[in-house]
Amino acid sequence: MSRVSQARNLGKYFLLIDNMLVVLGFFVVFPLISIRFVDQMGWAAVMVGIALGLRQFIQQGLGIFGGAIADRFGAKPMIVTGMLMRAAGFATMGIAHEPWLLWFSCLLSGLGGTLFDPPRSALVVKLIRPQQRGRFFSLLMMQDSAGAVIGALLGSWLLQYDFRLVCATGAVLFVLCAAFNAWLLPAWKLSTVRTPVREGMTRVMRDKRFVTYVLTLAGYYMLAVQVMLMLPIMVNDVAGAPSAVKWMYAIEACLSLTLLYPIARWSEKHFRLEHRLMAGLLIMSLSMMPVGMVSGLQQLFTLICLFYIGSIIAEPARETLSASLADARARGSYMGFSRLGLAIGGAIGYIGGGWLFDLGKSAHQPELPWMMLGIIGIFTFLALGWQFSQKRTARRLLERDA
């Protein structure tokens, strides 16, 4: 085995271990934020939505800067610093008794993610061969799902005692992850050239096809982020107990572990990436619309199952498309900018979703936010279809293994 192949194989194992620690640290805390502050402390959903949206927008919206800096200085210092900053954000969240302090903790958490997320994504593009990326992204998603349910179970158990224990556990996990990276991560360069920060950002902004694709995905993310805000609140309302939220993540884990990799392997042989992305988005949109009309937990979990199946189909295709469009001369900048759709869609999804949830509740129209989200998903589906049908983008966007 050549030294390059050996480095790639070792890099895969490193990425998987690192990803599991990050996912556990995140899901111990974040799925329970809406339960803690809306259900237990009686805050308006829009207040929590602002906090979650702020974290999302800062982490993903500023990702191009984090990626460009990582292109210049390397992945390791950015990743370690960002993870320590997120640990500080979680520690602050544990003592948040006023909205401004929750917002500040989410600000710290988001800034930390801005530093570590783009270089971690760029490492995947660097270490995984193009023809293997779709399957590796599927493995990461399976790991995400397993880590999500383990983290949510642990967080739900700790919440019975004290929310400060929840936040402390998340902070400790990110400190461990920072130490793991500081100790074992080599000083890898992300790009094929040592790209100046401004040049990497300029290269991305001039790539109109990539920019259009990323911004179009904002509608997709408006739906996807509801697993952190409105779906946990809905499960709690229908079940009457916060402990039921863990079953939502258990469903995701079971579906991902059993279906994600087989679906990815089968669909990559029979369907183009853009068709998989659009099919998954359509299923997610249609499953959202009836959520506000259900009154039983079984019906709600059935719709959540459909939503997760749509995500299982769409997400590996979306990740692979983003990676295939990245310029090797500025990988960090490209992967950072690819998060802008999540920044915009996530912020609108959290803040707008929280506002619509409160509005629907006060107007006795609980179906309002869910119908609106479904309609947004349909419009995004049509916008992606228009974009993929353009001859000027066909050669790049329809390339499965570029």
Swiss-Prot record:
Where is the protein situated, by its record's location annotation?
Answer: Cell inner membrane
Q: What is its main location?
A: membrane
- Matching PROSITE patterns: MFS
Cellular component per GO?
plasma membrane
Cytoplasmic side stretches: 1-12, 117-138, 186-213, 265-276, 321-339, 389-402
Its transmembrane ranges are 13-33, 99-116, 139-159, 165-185, 214-234, 244-264, 277-297, 300-320, 340-360, 368-388
Q: Which family does it belong to?
A: Belongs to the major facilitator superfamily. DHA1 family. MdtH (TC 2.A.1.2.21) subfamily.
Please describe what this protein does.
Confers resistance to norfloxacin and enoxacin.
Protein name per UniProt: Multidrug resistance protein MdtH
Q: Which organism is it from?
A: Escherichia coli (strain SMS-3-5 / SECEC)
Write the lineage as a comma-separated list. Bacteria, Pseudomonadati, Pseudomonadota, Gammaproteobacteria, Enterobacterales
